[in-house]
Amino acid sequence: MRDAGEGKQKHGQQEHIETLPLFSTTDKNGRMTMLRPGRRVGRAAPLIPWLITAAALWALTGSVPFGALLGMAPTPAINMLLGHPVTVGVAVLLLFVAIVMTGAVYSLSMEQFGQTRVAGLFSTLSVTGGLAAVAGVLLLWTLTSNPSRPFDLEAIATSPTIPLELGAVVGASFALWAAIALLRLPGSIAHARRRQADIERLRVEGSSYTGALTAVNFTNSWLFNLPIFTVEVNYIVDGAPRVVPAHMRTSDDRVPVVGSRMIVLTDDRGTTHVELDLASGAAFEPDVGKYAPSDG
């Protein structure tokens, strides 16, 4: 077995060590929530500037395909400008910057709220919101600069060239996607904050017990290549044994073995949180490829 404290970890691996494995007695998959020791309950305000910046980059990047390829340039001169090789080259560079910025939005969202569902919604909103915005601006600009031009969706099928209407439909699709993400975001943030508040409260006010991992069952499913398990944790309260079922998400090289020491936090409200006791020298499954996702 591999000892958790064996060797020194590189700085880039520290976050991986602190957050995995992740346990939840109430949620599973993307709704599982973490709160690192010493962190406060997450806030959305610090993410807004990053979200707006990422969306703006996607809008700038999307102006080229929407304007030059999807017929949404308001004038022939702007169409030529957007289709110029230099403009296309700049758009490609902006695309890479936008991808990096979107990754930063995801990482910062995870840092704030500790939940992949919330992080995914923030990053999705940055992409779809930016593309929907530029499509809307170009569509409005084109229609106002040429009010006599009819807007007919049938042109998508009948026009010999790529019509404005096709770009409008693509833009509307991104707008719908962005609206769905935006509508789901407040509830997801509230859920993550409640879970983090529970964890924070249990660490300060809850009763702490030493437990043991007595069952680890692989569900044969993964979330972003991270295997998902159902587990059972046994602990003793006033001489009586108790069992806590939980979901676990981890990496294939950090699957704790049966018998690993656990920390169980509970309160009078019936809220329970479990964590792996890394300080005790937890042992992990030695076959690191056992739970890796198959290529097929």
Q: Where do the protein language model's features map onto the residues?
A:
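Oxidizing extracytosolic/periplasmic lumen-facing domains
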Residues: 2-296
